[in-house]
UniProtKB/Swiss-Prot annotation:
Stretches with biased composition (Low complexity): 68-98
Name of this chain's protein: Genome polyprotein
Site (Cleavage) location in chain: 52-53
Annotated source species: Sugarcane mosaic virus (strain SC)
InterPro entries cross-referenced by the UniProt entry: Poty_coat (IPR001592)
Record EC number: 2.7.7.48
The family this protein is said to belong to: Belongs to the potyviridae genome polyprotein family.
Single GO cellular component term: viral capsid
Enzyme class: transferase
Molecular function per GO: RNA-directed RNA polymerase activity
Catalysed reactions listed for this entry: RNA(n) + a ribonucleoside 5'-triphosphate = RNA(n+1) + diphosphate
Location of region: Disordered: 56-136, 334-365
A Pfam family the protein falls into: Poty_coat
Stretches of the chain forming a coiled coil according to its record: none
């Protein structure tokens, strides 16, 4: 128990190295010590085991049921008036002529009856299915690897540049890596700039951002908008300047507003659950299906979960919104005058201001 070397009896060592035999008196000393230290060991050692020829359900739980079919007793024991076991008691082992059952002192209270009862089955218990030697095992379908080692991978200096195990677990959200949405750093910078310009705290900014989202649902988020935006405080209209909202938006204001796409979609759906509501973006495009109202705002961000019908409707509305728009890379230059130096020299004998003398030929009017 403490990790020490195994104990070897002195008699065994003497017999091993000296070749001397072992006397019965020496063995008796060990036997007496066993009887003193481990009394239960000797009682279990002296137990007699009887085997019955009945059927036993080894999988059933409990030990209070019948052990199985009782084989008929033969010999003197059967003629001596042996009684069958009572219902619920352990089955008695078969006896033959000349054999005696162990008494209580010899068995120490755990004799053959207890041993047989411990392996008995509960009456009415469910039997385990026997194993048939002719049955076959379950055939499993082989599973292919998600990424095979045989596929051609990009290599640099003879080594793969991709980590296949990482790719199997790398499943980012499409919106988080999309280049049509402002990064989190850009959004944080835009938020802090508006918070500083409006001189508001975080709790007040949540109300202002909610009002700005609803205003953009109705009026769009074109980078060309200017002036002010409004939100309602009950029946009172509150006006906020648009300049800090547009100027601090990077890369564009629409890419900033893409962060509000899911919230705006849920807001429109909520409004439609209480009243008939279509955003102004959908009214301008004459969208008649109110089930598509949740997609009728210009900063809606399409993803893999967007239905095909909703994608088509949103694309048609976007095409109608941008039709006829002409974005010029360069405007009219303010310096419209032409500065060109005239190096021509004219004399009085020239035909005209733009024509020199042609060998005395005079121009008549």
């Amino acid at each position: 128990k403490e990790g020490l070397a195994p104990y070897i009896a002195e008699t065994a060592l003497r017999n091993l190295y000296l070749g001397s035999g072992i006397k019965e008196e020496e063995i008796e000393k060990y036997f007496k010590q066993f009887a003193k230290d481990l009394p239960g060991y000797l009682e279990d050692y002296n137990d007699e085991v009887f085997h019955q020829a009945g059927t036993v359900d080894a999988g059933a739980q409990g030990g209070g049921g019948n052990a199985g079919t009782q084989p008929p007793a033969t010999g003197a024991a059967a003629q001596g008036g042996a009684q069958p076991p009572a219902t619920g008691a352990a089955a008695q082992p078969p006896t033959t002529q000349g054999s005696q059952l162990p008494q209580g002192g010899a068995t120490g209270g755990g004799g053959a009856q207890t041993g047989a009862g411990g392996t008995g089955s509960v009456t009415g218990g469910q039997r385990d299915k026997d194993v048939d030697a002719g049955t076959t095992g379950k055939i499993t379908v082989p599973k292919l690897k998600a990424m095979s080692k045989k596929m051609r991978l990009p290599k640099a200096k003879g080594q793969d540049v991709l980590h296949l195990d990482f790719l199997l677990t790398y499943k980012p959200q499409q919106q988080d890596i999309s280049n049509t949405r402002a990064t989190r750093e850009e959004f944080d910078r835009w938020y802090e700039a508006i918070k500083k310009e409006y001189e508001l705290d975080d709790t007040q900014m949540t109300v202002v951002m909610s009002g700005l989202m609803v205003w953009c649902i109705e009026n769009g988020c074109s980078p060309n908008i200017s002036g002010s935006w409004t939100m309602m405080d009950g029946d009172e209209q509150t006006v906020f300047p648009l300049k800090p909202v547009i100027e601090n938006a990077s890369p564009t204001f629409r890419q900033i507003m893409h962060h509000f796409s899911d919230a705006a979609e849920a807001y429109i759906e909520y409004r439609n659950s209480t009243e008939r509501y279509m955003p102004r973006y959908g009214l301008q495009r004459n969208l008649t299906d109110y089930s598509l109202a949740r997609y009728a705002f210009d900063f809606y961000e399409m993803n893999s979960r967007t239905p095909a019908r909703a994608k088509e409707a949103h694309m048609q509305m976007k095409a109608a919104a941008v039709r006829g728009s002409n974005t010029r890379l360069f405007g009219l230059d303010g310096n419209v005058g032409e500065t060109q130096e005239n190096t021509e020299r004219h004399t009085a004998g020239d035909v005209s201001r733009n024509m020199h003398s042609l060998l005395g030929v005079q121009q008549h009017h």
